[in-house]
Amino acid sequence: MITKHNISNLFEFVKKQKKSNILRIDLINKSFVLSQHTKTNHIFIDKNGVNFNCKIEKQINEIAQILLPIVMMKKKFYIGQIGQSLDGKIALLNGNSHYINDKNSISYLHSLRSICDAVVVGVNTIKKDNPLLTTRAIKGSNPQRIIIDPSLKLTNKYQIFKDGLSNIIFTHSNIKKNLNNTKILKLPERNFTNLVYQHIN
């Protein structure tokens, strides 16, 4: 069974070992322990792929098949996440969307944050939701916060400017503004979206 605890351990290990050439998952009493040591029962991941040398629970197998090969690849991966109601809505009529996801979805979202180098949002997400964009529901590292704010409308009243963590804002505005713990990167207005994409990559 996938739990908040074991998926957190897996994500945290993958995060720390992104540059490693060899990863191992050792199974002990139908559970798994992550290490770089050779054991009898293990899953061996090398540059040629994933080799399973033992039985593994289906759910953990699925996690490993998706996440661990990513470690061995050099190209960037992008993960999109959206929460919506059963009838396809992402907010109430008054714009309130806190929280449209349940607790399990929130834990999953924070798990994704813990393995990502950065989280990218638009200015309206900050203005309407006032999020922290940090990893809190599980143990894990925080991603770099990147905000796309073309007209530089944000002010220091939002949470992301009050917790001491760093932010990067992309804008094409000429407005001079001092935002706490924030690096503001000005790009030309023409082809702004494409230029942001190129910088993120």
Specify the residue positions occupied by each region the protein language model found.
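Active-site ligand-binding patch in enzyme domains
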Residues: 2-86, 90-201
